[in-house]
């Protein structure tokens, strides 16, 4: 007896695989980004971006500045809220990750951070998340001691934060991660267009090599 199996395949005429090489590409409704494999970085003053081996789900994380470094000054930006206006200018320490999307509309960006305690009351645990020229969101890598969120983050060895952005057209885009309070550690970034499935460690990288 013959049976027919139907398989859904997405095979657009363009861009070619060659054109996508080196980019993180949307696959099954999401883009998964390896934090240690950024496309560009801009270091300012004392703020340097370091790859730290032996930590995180993939045994490698990016440290957003030395925790003892002076917190960067952002003109008109206070590191005390979850949202700020678009960052203008190029005087900020930032990591940039290029990705290619086939869809448009609202997207959720998940940043996977190592859970961390600030050094003291003068240090926080905020970092910036931006897509293209969107507003910047400032989630926290830390949580109040012994809170439910802190316990969950420690058990999972990861603090996962969600910010929502807007993709206006298909094509190449850029996720930007800003150093807010130095010392935060980034494991992974996932851009969800609606296809992300629930998992413990998040999806593997969708970079085309």
Q: PLM features: residue spans?
A:
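Extracytoplasmic
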Residues: 1-209
